[in-house]
């Protein structure tokens, strides 16, 4: 699933007030009646519908006793993200109907507006939509209106760019901990004690590198990638010399 469908900054100029909404315990709070109604609209096979319903309502053990479940989807199952997206597709459609700029990745989403007044209005209306239509509780303590420089999203951050006569422009960057995570993975693969053939080591590096770059491809990463590439080349040379 893509984080951004277009680069925030290309056509996003002036969107400086972010509505950050935290869905409280999303997977545990999914309302079965709302979800099943949406599934019934899409799936016509009675057997499939019956299996989904049984899977959703399978009893869970609490304090040694089995209890029926009327809300929530089991985390860790491959079905859970699919069913959750069926529910949150209604949110996507509502935001698109309002012609709002937004980013959603699973239950993590934010809406971008041009003023605090608009942000407050949009935030209140979406709070009502989530509660009334989807029956999803909102964590008000973790929700609010943010400025780009104070906001993080899935390893990304925004830093202001300063140009004479231009205000409200931000550059999309990658957070330090995301860079550190990539470097740790590369370091593990290039340890000389790892019993990899050289071709195997290169393949593993390529998988990690390309996966990370694809995830953060819309951020400003070229300069740091060049520096990281030089560091990686030196480690690979050391692996060859140590053979």
Each model region followed by its residue ranges:
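Short, residue-level hotspots on alpha-helical faces of the histone-fold
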Residues: 54, 58, 85-90, 207, ...
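Hydrophobic packing residues in well-ordered alpha-helices of helical domains and bundles
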Residues: 102, 119, 123, 202-205, ...
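A conserved non-catalytic segment of reverse transcriptases
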Residues: 57, 133-203, 208-210
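Conserved nucleotidyltransferase catalytic core and NTase-mimicking acidic/glycine-rich helix/loop elements
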Residues: 204, 217-243
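Structural motif
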Residues: 43-47, 78, 195-204, 223
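Conserved polymerase palm-domain catalytic core
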Residues: 2-150
